[in-house]
Amino acid sequence: MIGWLQGQKVEAWQQGTRQGVVLACAGVGYEVQIAPRHLSEMEHGQNTFILWIHQVQRDDGSSLFGFPERRERDMFRTLIGVSGVGPQMALALLEECQTGELVEAIVQGDLRKLCQAQGVGKRTAERLAVELRTKLAEFSCRDPGMSLVDNGVIDSHQLKDSSLHELQITLGGLGYEDLEIRRAIRAVASGAAIGASDMPESVPSIDDTDAWLRASLRWLSQEAA
């Protein structure tokens, strides 16, 4: 079983909707399917790459799926463990969303977001949410790479990483669960939080951690009402 490959990109290929690269490793060329967004990233800069690999073995041969990050490969494996979700659908989900965004969508049951991926219907989206919600909620709590800033849930210009960590610690100390905290911060960052005057709040400034805390607490109290 191949775990990862390091080599030079010889060429890009496309067969219908499937895209990938031929990676030359120690004199052997491996044909690896990757998400289109990663293919465009590989068009620029260095020519040597490391891809984490998932290998699918069939009677008529094997297929390799490559990912620049291990956690994305692991997410792919989690997705294909769900009944009715094959490698192509899993890749489509990871093309539509970055890993952290996909975790958020599944945990929150955001069926509309999941259905934006090619080939994903409402029933499949519901199955993903039901079967993976608890598992991925635990995964997001454990994985230090699942930062709200790193996965694009909030912008680094909205809140410094150190301030974000302080905010999460403070809310956790008040008894809120990690998932509740992440949803609250996301709501405040997107401008979806409602202020005391029943009007949408403006996003607090990057340096005003207290304002972020107040807005998050208001959102959490409204959700609990």
From Swiss-Prot:
Q: Which HAMAP family does UniProt cross-reference here? A: DNA_HJ_migration_RuvA
Q: Name one GO cellular component term.
A: Holliday junction helicase complex
Q: Which domain of life is it from?
A: Bacteria
* Keyword vocabulary terms for this entry: Cytoplasm, DNA damage, DNA recombination, DNA repair, DNA-binding
Key word DNA damage present = yes
This entry's Gene Ontology molecular function terms read: ATP binding; four-way junction DNA binding; four-way junction helicase activity
Where in or outside the cell it occurs: the entry states: Cytoplasm
Q: What is this protein called?
A: Holliday junction branch migration complex subunit RuvA
State any GO BP term from the record.
DNA repair
Gene3D superfamilies assigned:
5' to 3' exonuclease, C-terminal subdomain, Nucleic acid-binding proteins
